[in-house]
């Protein structure tokens, strides 16, 4: 199969993509979070093609993307008042809400669960495609399972060339990490996966917001997309350090000395880079100022893809505190590091 990257976002081209989606093909589409691998969310056979392209287990739930809030009504049994508040506050945007599914939604979309994950993206091109397709689009991240999520069309192509017919190129994703996934219950809102909408933002509009136990315990059964299996791993082994730039630079130097002749790659803040640049040789990416979770989120996956291309032996990263958007970034970084994070 030849994979075509669509860069001219004309109505005719978007119609072509929508037609392909509606009739069972898998297409990579842009969102504000990461690129998604889209298929008709009401067609179990089409969703099987997503799992085949990603090499992803079919018991992992998918998110159904819709162009507007009205579109979710046939997909759910009910919309609780708390969910309505969240929709008004954060849609379109990087918030996925799980609700009791209707019989219209195939079990294939939910991984066999009785709740469906729904999101309205804050991305004009994506919503145009959704409108034209006329069906909800199931779309996990458009990468081979276990690899870093893509925030550019080129990163999608590197993983999906020959596996899907089309990639819609709308430039780099503005947020850079996946959506927040929440479950709405009578007693409050549970964050199943941290993402672009923070706990603090949710608490501004609803009461009783908490994190799901699975985020800190691997013994709990996951209820959200992207939380069951290994994710986000670069090719080279990766370690991360969190602390002030001086301590991070010292920790980096100790590891670099241990690695001796091996080639390293370093994801760091501007302040840490200034402390290392004259003495350390390797592949650097500076994401922004120390503690800037927004900048790190934007650059994280893109940088991991770049480091994969550089054929390095190991990766060292400077993390941020687990507050605000930092919770989502560090969740992804911890997975990329296989848990090898040191707080200095």
Q: Where do the language-model regions lie?
A:
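Active-site-adjacent structural elements in enzyme catalytic cores
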Residues: 1-344
């Amino acid at each position: 199969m030849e994979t075509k990257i669509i860069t001219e976002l004309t109505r005719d081209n978007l119609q072509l993509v929508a037609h392909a989606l509606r009739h069972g093909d898998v297409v990579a589409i842009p969102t504000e979070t990461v690129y998604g691998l889209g298929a008709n969310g009401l067609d179990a056979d089409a969703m099987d093609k997503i799992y085949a392209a990603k090499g992803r287990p079919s018991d992992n739930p998918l998110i159904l993307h819709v162009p507007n809030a009205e579109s979710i009504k046939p997909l759910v049994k009910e919309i609780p008042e708390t969910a309505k508040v969240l929709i008004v506050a954060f849609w379109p945007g990087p918030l996925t809400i799980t609700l009791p599914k209707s019989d219209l939604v195939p079990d294939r979309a939910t991984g066999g669960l009785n709740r469906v994950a729904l999101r309205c993206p804050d991305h004009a091109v994506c919503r145009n495609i959704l409108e034209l397709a006329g069906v909800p689009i199931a779309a996990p991240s458009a990468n081979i399972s276990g690899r870093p999520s893509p925030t550019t069309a080129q990163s999608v192509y590197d993983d999906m060339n020959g596996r899907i017919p089309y990639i819609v190129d709308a430039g780099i994703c503005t947020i850079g990490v996946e959506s927040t996934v929440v479950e709405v219950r009578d007693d409050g809102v549970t964050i199943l996966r941290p993402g672009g909408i923070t706990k603090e933002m949710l608490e501004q509009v609803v009461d009783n917001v908490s994190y799901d136990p699975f985020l800190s315990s691997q013994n709990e059964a996951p209820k959200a997309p992207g939380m069951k299996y290994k994710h986000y791993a670069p090719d080279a082994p990766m370690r991360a350090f969190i602390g002030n730039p001086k301590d991070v630079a010292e920790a980096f130097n100790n590891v670099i000395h241990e690695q001796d002749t091996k080639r390293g790659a370093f994801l760091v803040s501007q302040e840490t880079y200034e402390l290392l640049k004259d003495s350390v040789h390797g592949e650097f990416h500076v994401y922004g100022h120390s503690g800037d979770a927004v900048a790190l989120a934007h650059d994280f996956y893109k940088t991991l893809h770049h480091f994969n291309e550089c054929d390095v032996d190991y990766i060292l990263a400077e993390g941020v505190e687990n507050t605000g958007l930092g919770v989502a970034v560090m969740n992804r970084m911890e997975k990329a590091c296989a848990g090898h994070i040191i707080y200095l």
